[in-house]
Amino acid sequence: MALYSISKPVGSKINKHSYQDENTLVGKQALSKGTEKTKLSTNFEINLPRRTVLSDVSNVGKNNADEKDTKKAKRSFDESNLSTNEEADKPVESKFVKKLKVYSKNADPSVETLQKDRVSNVDDHLSSNPLMAEEYAPEIFEYIRKLDLKCLPNPKYMDQQKELTWKMREILNEWLVEIHSNFCLMPETLYLAVNIIDRFLSRRSCSLSKFQLTGITALLIASKYEEVMCPSIQNFVYMTDGAFTVEDVCVAERYMLNVLNFDLSYPSPLNFLRKISQAEGYDAQTRTLGKYLTEIYLFDHDLLRYPMSKIAAAAMYLSRRLLRRGPWTPKLVESSGGYEEHELKEIAYIMLHYHNKPLEHKAFFQKYSSKRFLKASIFVHQLVRQRYSVNRTDDDDLQSEPSSSLTNDGH
């Protein structure tokens, strides 16, 4: 059954030269209205992720959603940026030591040492974040941890979807990552959009033909909620490559908000990351890796059953292990909300396993392969495949930790 009953008006095709707002992303001619300062270069449209997603899996049945059925849905990916088998023997640290410093296995870096290794990062000025206010932080984080449990979607909601699969969720979320990056939206906007999709699908069934509409509408809603200057609805519609109209998105927006009872409360995992980062001395390197590892949540449905506070804590725990930043101290346990090391290892293992699978999320990988994110995706893929290979069981290599170190209680 279709999710929305909408009849598209005649002549509703979007004219890419006709619309305007503060975040104009298309058009070769100067617009007659608006200010010049708010317009972006028209060269930007070359990389716009404008397309109809999931159109190549329209015949995939619910019961045939294995790797063979969804082969056409996987977009090509150039793995030239990753090390080859011959390069795997080279120390990963030597390639990215200027960006991400990996301490020796027996090192116990102090907070003062980590402060010297800080790099420029968009989250450096955490003091301006009201959630980090010392006077109110305990009450604030107690509230958002309760909210975190309230906002959990049904981790098995795909069982009630007749036409959708988890693979389709990955494809949709990767497309949203592309749009999110091209629109230069806040990180919180992406997480809220995905949470809206997951919570909505936990309550309602959705047809494959309306799945992209659900995704783009969720991103629009999240943008209105989080952004200071939200892109116009025409911008979002344009990204669907004519698959939907402005009216379609407006109807979907009203319907989705009614299903969610207009409740858009959602604690971003970045709030928990920043809290832990504060406890460890604001090490921007571990925090950057933590952001990358946390975003795996968008593509691995096994993480849906965990609250975002625990996923963020596990991401920081794993990033510290990968960079050998020392043990998970009582101070870090307290700042994470009380999560002990043994409670985080299961999630850390899921994150490790993600990197032992073939790469297929191009937009996600490329996003974190930039200098802005310290080439975190390249670094982690190479390091995990070296140090935590699924086929590795020996502990003889003194330069790495045993493959079981994240699954057993021992160190």
From Swiss-Prot:
Gene for this chain: cig2
One protein family per Pfam: Cyclin_C
Source superkingdom: Eukaryota
UniProt name for this protein: G2/mitotic-specific cyclin cig2
Domain Cyclin N-terminal positions: 139-265
Modification after translation (UniProt): Phosphorylated.
Entry similarity comment: Belongs to the cyclin family. Cyclin AB subfamily.
Motif Destruction box per record, residues: 51-60
Region called Disordered, residue ranges: 57-89
PROSITE patterns, per database record: CYCLINS
Substitution effect: R169A: Prevents binding to cdc2 and improves protein stability
Composition bias, Basic and acidic residues: 64-78
Residue ranges the record marks as coiled coil: none
Species this chain originates from: Schizosaccharomyces pombe (strain 972 / ATCC 24843)
Biological processes per GO annotation: cell division; DNA recombination; G1/S transition of mitotic cell cycle; mitotic G1 cell size control checkpoint signaling; negative regulation of conjugation with cellular fusion; positive regulation of G1/S transition of mitotic cell cycle; regulation of cell cycle switching, mitotic to meiotic cell cycle; traversing start control point of mitotic cell cycle
